[in-house]
Regions:
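Early transmembrane hairpin of solute transport permeases
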Residues: 16, 20-161, 331
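Alpha-helical transmembrane segments in multi-pass membrane proteins
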Residues: 40, 78, 82, 86, ...
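Hydrophobic alpha-helical transmembrane segments
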Residues: 69-81, 136-139, 218-238, 270-289, ...
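Inter-helical loop and helix-membrane interface segments of multi-pass membrane transporters/permeases
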Residues: 48-69, 106-135, 164-166, 198-216, ...
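Membrane-interface helix-loop-helix junctions at boundaries between adjacent transmembrane segments
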Residues: 115-185, 189-223
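Generic multipass alpha-helical transmembrane bundles of integral membrane proteins
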Residues: 182-300
Length: 435
């Protein structure tokens, strides 16, 4: 067995393990299901916070109304995440997800510290937004997974109330989940009380200090995004869906980083994170493959390459690369593998350098829908400069691809010419026979 075959076999084995992991699936799918909520909040933030003096003066009387959806979406996303992750995980175990989702929501809230304010003789207990947004996202993931798993465990142990026949299914399902729900709720209520007695003061503070800050520092570095890109591209070269594997691992970190930026942008504060999911999307997702399309369409002589370029161009404009990956193919192609792996990394590094030197702005963290085209996907991150940067990186990526494509193009063109010559000779021979 060759190295390539061994790598592919092992890679597919471990990739399938990651893809089949129920906890990873629940977190990834749970966050993905929140995309409509995140988009609502992102547009609310963008429309209320665009730094254009004339525009700000125009919307000043109703700016707070425009910003209101962001307060209950972006700044409260952890609440939605706690529900959706538990819902998805329960479903993966074959259980109805609604009750575990609500129990997870309760558990998350009961673990959330309540702030006390005094206004004269009036004492106000308030649930602030401090832990409901980006800072509470990792805690929401943990709570969502634990509550759903505990609920499933109690149901599997038959700790349920069985209703007699004839009771409507909706009522029967509600009562069957009552005991597991109460048990989980009691456990998390006790847990909340125990965390109050620790030096952290709450479960949220513990997760944020011990887990979320270190992971975001690690995941939000230029080195981590380059390594993730290299792994993703390498997996694609061996025919493994690299995006599914890599994004399943890094999406929670990148989402939290984006949410912090979006909240800072809305508040008019400097954005704290440079490398985020939005940064990845802008610089790694479009220009590299469009550079390949330019080479195929305008610099290649092979008819086959030109046809593949025409077929792949529309998808590449919207970040869809499979026609090129499998059409050329790039899969198991050692020559094209080199520029395919390197070009997005080069784009990311250049984007990073231009950002730290203040030539380009930091992306605001908007959750742009998948399929948003190049340029628009950059502009939606807060500046036209990002859209222009995407375009300017296309010729750079074309230069990276050109020498490698040229090797294959020359070979393909010679084969096509030889085939055409043979076909013409065969036609002439047939004409002589007929005449």
């Amino acid at each position: 067995m060759t190295f390539a075959e061994t790598f592919t076999e092992k890679g597919q084995y471990y990739a399938s393990k990651i893809q089949q992991n129920k906890y990873m699936q629940a977190i990834s799918n749970g966050l993905m299901s929140l995309l409509p909520i995140m988009i609502i909040g992102a547009f609310s933030t963008l429309l209320s916070s665009m730094q254009i003096d004339v525009y700000q003066s125009m919307i000043a009387p109703f700016r707070d109304i425009i910003a209101l959806p962001a307060q209950f979406t972006t700044n409260a996303l952890a609440i939605y995440a706690a529900f959706s992750i538990a819902y998805k995980l329960a479903g993966l175990y074959g259980k109805e997800g609604l009750i575990p989702g609500f129990v997870s929501l309760f558990s998350f809230l009961v673990l959330t510290p309540i702030s006390v304010f005094e206004d004269g003789e009036l004492v106000i207990n308030a649930l602030t937004f401090d832990w409901l947004g980006a800072r509470g996202l990792f805690a929401a993931m943990i709570v969502g997974v634990l509550t759903a798993r505990l609920y499933v465990f109690f149901v599997d142990k038959n700790l349920v109330i069985t209703m007699p026949e004839g009771v409507p299914p909706t009522i029967a399902k509600t009562f069957s989940g009552l005991v597991p729900a109460v048990l989980v709720a009691v456990l998390f209520t006790i847990t909340a009380g125990l965390w109050k007695m620790t030096e952290f003061g709450s479960f949220h503070q513990f997760v944020y200090t011990i887990l979320q800050i270190p992971l975001q520092s690690l995941g939000g570095s230029i080195w981590s995004i380059c390594i993730a890109l290299l792994i993703m591209q390498l997996l694609w070269v061996f025919g493994i869906h690299g995006a599914i594997v890599v994004l399943a691992v890094i999406r929670p970190i990148m989402t939290a980083l984006d949410l912090e930026n979006l909240a800072a942008y809305q508040a008019g504060e400097p954005m704290p994170n440079l490398v985020t999911g939005s940064f990845w999307s802008i610089y790694a997702n479009f220009s590299a493959m469009l550079g390949l399309v330019v080479v195929l369409l305008f610099l290649s002589k092979s008819k086959q390459f030109k046809i593949i370029g025409k077929l792949g161009a529309p998808g590449a404009l919207f970040g869809i690369h499979e026609p090129l990956i499998f059409g050329l193919p790039i899969v198991m192609n050692p020559i094209l593998a080199i520029p395919y792996i390197l070009s997005p990394v080069v784009c990311v590094v250049i984007g990073y350098i231009l950002t730290i030197t203040n030539i380009l702005p930091i992306p605001i963290g908007m959750q742009v829908p998948f399929g948003a085209p190049i340029v628009l996907s950059g502009i939606l991150q807060g500046s036209w400069k990002l859209g222009v940067a995407q375009l300017l990186m296309i010729p750079l990526c074309a230069l990276i691809y050109y020498p490698f494509v040229r090797i294959l193009d020359k070979k393909n063109a010679e084969q096509e010419l030889a085939q055409e010559t043979q076909e013409k000779a065969a036609e002439q021979s047939m004409d002589r026979v007929i005449s």
